[in-house]
Structure formats: structure tokens, C-alpha cells
Amino acid sequence: MRILMVTDAWRPQVNGVVHTLERLSETLKSFDVETDFLTPNIFRTLPLPTYPDIMLALTTPHRVARLIEARKVDHVHIVTEGPLGIMARRYCRNAGRPFTTSYHTRFPEYLSARLPVPEAWAYRWLRDFHNSGQGTLVATQSLADDLAARGFTKLRPSTRGVDTDHFRPDKRKDLGFPGPIFLCVGRVAIEKNLPAFLDLDLPGSKVVVGEGPELAKLKARYPDTHFLGHRPNDELAEIYASADAFVFPSRTDTFGNVIIEALASGTPVAAYPVTGPIDIIGDGIGGAVSDDLRQAALAALHVDRAEARQRAMRYSWKACAEMFMKTVEEALGTTRKLAA
């Protein structure tokens, strides 16, 4: 089977969507599934206003339709709700082709953080976008419950995976900062709510890994925080394992891949009780969640690091691929036996 992934998020972006697509595509090979991608990289692009790191494709519905037809794929999966996703959806509906979608990003909250756009308007549009397909993949039960309450239908379970061979506790070393070390990894952007972490009165050191549009501003505002910028994957694994607690201040993520990377490294996680953290560590195993983020961060210092590692072991890319293919097969009305 050949599947076309249509995504407005792609390299050189470094984010959870791109990482998930890369790992899912690689894992699907063992299911005898070949994936192709339609991304902004083959078009002229325009930076997204207020977020220049994201490039939007400048093209037409007719060209997108021709490109999809030329790929001769068995199924179209729409990953994002940007220009390419919108045009691919239009093509599928006009051609009478079944398609599936993913709900990766809480765009209504992202938009309202930057522009005076009511969240209700954005959710209404997203509901119509996703409900017109044959299935929408969501990574957590709490997200599914929230979207269902907003009128989304055809929601299908998904998950995320983590490379537990790469992210592991034995990579722990001395980072050279006073302990305990509180770490945060991710895009340095307004929707990630980093000041909620950086404003906390915590002992030891705060360390932030990642790039983004807010980096210069936050560096100036928080001179005592260690901002390390982007780090290669090998070095990132060492940093994860060397922290004493991982703090996840975002309230708008739909999962939080960095959470399970930290857990796989044996580092307990502190977060708000919101979608993603509540699903992964809401039972107190592997971390702590609280509306008082400082309380959660301090509590995480006392969480068993072996338990954190064990919690990460339940997340695999094979399970993610199996859930993905089940949704695709439902959309196509097939019951193919997947390769082992």
C-alpha cells in the first residue's frame, strides 16, 4: 500500500509533528506500507505572520490536485490544516476519495495567543475540516474527550513512540550547573508558556534547550537561566538524562513528545494537569501534575527515576503505526492483514 502524507509542517522545522511523521513513516515500512509526502518544500513559500520559522506553501488547488493524482497512491492522509491540507481536502472531496486526518495542534489557542481570533470560531472551522474525513487521529483520551465535546466526530485513537535505546538513563553526566537541574526542551515560542517555568522560585539551575521566536526576548528577561539553543540528538539525550526534573509548562500541546523522551531518560516530569501530561503521568507514576507548577517541580525531584523510565516503555512507534493503519483500513473499507 502507498499512502500520501500531506503536511504543512516539514523540515527544516524541528517540532513534534515532523518528528512523529518521520518515525511513523520509518515504522510503516515493516507493515509493507510505503509513504510519500507532499510538503511545502517543493513550492514557493511565505513565512507565517508572527511565526517566521513556519513556511506556508504558495500554490493553487489545481496544482495540488495534479500532484496528488500523479503520486498514484492508495490513500491520502492530511496531517495539518494549513494551505496544503486545505487544498488536499478540497481535492479529496471533489474527487470522492476517502481521506483521514490528524489533530496534532491546538491552533485555536495558538491563534488567540497571537491574534484577536475567538477560539470558538477557530474550533468551528476545524470541526468542519476534520468531520468531512473518514477518521481523525488523536493522541490522547483527554484530547478525544475535549474534541468530542466540541462536536468533532469520527475520532480515532493514536499514540506516540519514543526511542528507548537512544533516550536512556545511563547517559547521565555532570552538566556543570548547580543542582538540582530543572530542564525544559522544546520550541521557544509564546504558546509553550515558558515564563510559567522561568518565573518559578526553584533551587539549583533552570536549563532550556530549543530555538524559537521568543528566544532573544527570554534570554534578556531571564539572565540566570541557561539557554542552550538547539542541540544535536546525541547531546540532547545526555542533557535529558542529566537533569533532575523535566518541567513541561505548556497548556496547549496535544501530547508532548518531549515528556516521554524525558521519562525514557529516567527524568521525572512536572506539568500542569492538562491534555498530554494528564494522560501520561496523571496517576503520579513518572512525575507530578499540579495547577501549582512549582509544587509539581519540587515533587518531581522525589519521583523514582526507574519508575519514570518504566512509564516510557509503554509508548512505541509500532503501536502508533498499528493504530494509524487501522484507521486507514477503516476509511478504505478494507481488512488487510498487516505484516508483522
Where are these regions (language model features)?
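Conserved donor-binding/catalytic core segment of Leloir-type glycosyltransferases
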Residues: D174-V207
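Nucleotide-activated donor-binding/catalytic signature segment of Leloir-type glycosyltransferases, i.e.
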Residues: A216-E235
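Donor nucleotide-sugar binding/catalytic pocket of nucleotide-sugar-dependent glycosyltransferases
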Residues: R124-D170
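Aromatic "clamp/platform" in nucleotide-sugar-dependent glycosyltransferases that forms part
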Residues: R251
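Nucleotide-sugar donor phosphate/pyrophosphate-binding loop at the beta->alpha transition
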Residues: P98-T100, E109-D128
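Short hydrophobic beta-strand element within catalytic cores of glycosyltransferases
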Residues: A264, P268-A271
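Short alpha-helical donor nucleotide-sugar binding micro-motif in glycosyltransferases
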Residues: H130, R231, E238-A243, F324
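A charged, aromatic-enriched C-terminal amphipathic alpha-helix characteristic of glycosyltransferases
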Residues: H302-A339
